[in-house]
Amino acid sequence: MLRMATLASGSSGNCAVVSDGRVHILIDAGISTRRIAQGLKGLGLELRHITGVLITHEHSDHVAALPVLCRQCGAALFTAEGTAFALCARWPGLEERFRVFAPGQRFALGEWEIGTFATSHDCACPAGFSVEDGRRKLALCTDTGYVTPQARAGVRGAHTLIGEFNYDPQMLRTGPYPRQLQARIAGD
């Protein structure tokens, strides 16, 4: 049975684990590799057990651990082409680790089928994911300004839906962001 555990969620870092006891993946790696390893240990896992890392987008709170994680773990990185391009520009040398997809594409990862869908966020090519093991479907959608038609279709039929969005109107108004960015975040 598919199980999901959140290791971190929020502006300071995002990382989740999906496992069925045989296949283990991370969704995003926005916290330190040390924190990821500690979280995995609490689940009875180690970094070496990770089969792959699904990356939603290139913002630091979703990918901060990638360079170190890639050195310590042999897992492939699955992300949209635009996101892979942005990450390779930031961290040359990761190119061979990426398995790229176009949002809407499906692919196999172990015995699972991974679905991908476009989300709405201010980055190169943001994506959400569904994970299916033949019996259950889990879907994850993060940092999206609104639910795109593709996201709606991608999460349809999910037994478990994880949404990660943090938005505080008061923090936004009083924070350091310029007005134009505040308007975009607020959906104006």
Residues of each region from the PLM?
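Conserved beta-strand hairpin/beta-sheet module of binuclear metal-dependent hydrolase folds
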Residues: 1-43, 127-143, 160
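Active-site neighborhood of phospho(di)ester-bond hydrolases with catalytic His/Asp-centered motifs
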Residues: 27-30, 50-58, 78-81, 139-143, ...
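Short, well-ordered alpha-helix to beta-strand connector turns
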Residues: 50, 95, 158-159
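Metallo-beta-lactamase
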Residues: 80-135
